[in-house]
Design a protein with these regions (language model features):
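Sec-dependent N-terminal signal peptides
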Residues: 4-13
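Beta-strand-rich domain onsets/edges
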Residues: 18-31
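Beta-strand-rich recognition domains
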Residues: 26-29, 42, 92-258
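Short, ordered, surface-exposed loop/turn motifs in non-cytosolic proteins
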Residues: 30-32, 39-54
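Beta-strand-rich extracellular modules
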Residues: 37, 82-84, 232-236
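Hydrophobic beta-strand segments
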Residues: 48-52, 65, 79, 195
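Short, acidic Ser/Thr/Gly-rich low-complexity loop/linker segments typical of extracellular
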Residues: 55-68
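A short, solvent-exposed loop/turn motif at the edges and junctions
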Residues: 76, 80-100
Length: 258
């Protein structure tokens, strides 16, 4: 019997924002080998690109949607799945998940997505302890404590529900993340990363996780004009001698309208 592991805990608990909810999609651990399928029809998807950015590893699904992960890693790492005509998808996996057959369900695009960033981003100051969430997986240099990107949104988005979707995020060291066993930092914790839309704070991200959706208030949208999203990492709340930014990594940022 299929055992579907819906990755919803971080999506349900990890965001403090009005009307935040969970994105459908998940991973199953049944069958022989790994497979990429259409999330709605379960039809196999060929030619999907599956990558582990930190391991510099990439492969594609065959005509039956099957693929192998011939990469060695330990601890959490982000796996990305890309296919033309489908929404960006990423998943945090470890060696235990990778050791079992996976079925990855990805969703067809509705043509209204705006891809903000598909590459891996490292925010912070490159100063983190071994107990920090996923610190053993940090391989990129930090670009600084925040990331900002501008983009355009059409006037018809005002009649839709619009979301900033974060494909995957790791490294958050909040008190909530610690209570959920996502890090082993004993004597300190950080404030949550903050999300700003057109200069207004709209959310805090409390937990590490995948496919987190943050509602964009329609009254803040600049229709047919330039809009701006900023993600700012948190700060160590027990360090008062200097500013110690929490180091986090994230991937696959997009605007999705429904």
């Amino acid at each position: 019997m299929k055992k579907i592991l819906i990755l919803s805990l971080a999506m349900l608990l990890g965001i403090t924002a009005a009307n935040a909810d969970a994105l459908t999609g998940g991973v199953s651990t049944v069958g022989l080998g790994n497979k990429v399928v259409d999330a709605n029809t379960n039809a196999p998807i060929s030619g999907a690109q599956i990558s582990l950015p930190k391991q510099n590893y990439s492969t594609k699904s065959d005509e039956n949607g099957n693929f192998n992960l011939n990469a060695n890693f330990s601890g959490n790492t982000i796996m990305s799945v890309k296919k033309d005509g489908y929404k960006p998808f990423s998943l945090t996996i470890d060696e235990h998940i990778a050791a079992r057959p996976m079925i990855l369900g990805i969703q067809k695009s509705n043509g209204r997505e705006v891809v903000i960033e598909s590459a891996m981003l490292h925010l912070g100051d490159n100063n983190f302890s071994a107990g920090s969430a996923n610190s053993d997986q940090f391989k990129l240099k930090a670009i600084g404590p925040f990331y900002t990107k501008t983009f355009k949104m059409s006037a018809n988005t005002l009649n839709l529900n619009n979301y900033l979707v974060i494909g995957s995020i790791i490294g958050i060291d909040t008190a909530m993340a610690r209570s959920m066993g996502q890090n082993s930092v004993r004597n300190s914790f950080s404030s949550p990363p903050e999300v700003y839309f057109n200069g207004t704070k709209i959310a805090e991200i409390q937990l590490n996780g995948d496919n987190q959706k943050i509602k964009l208030p329609n009254n803040l949208i600049r229709a047919d004009n330039t809009n701006e999203v900023t993600i700012q990492t948190g700060k160590n709340l027990t360090q008062h001698a200097y500013v110690d930014y929490d180091d986090i990594e994230l991937m696959n940022l997009s605007i999705q309208s429904e």
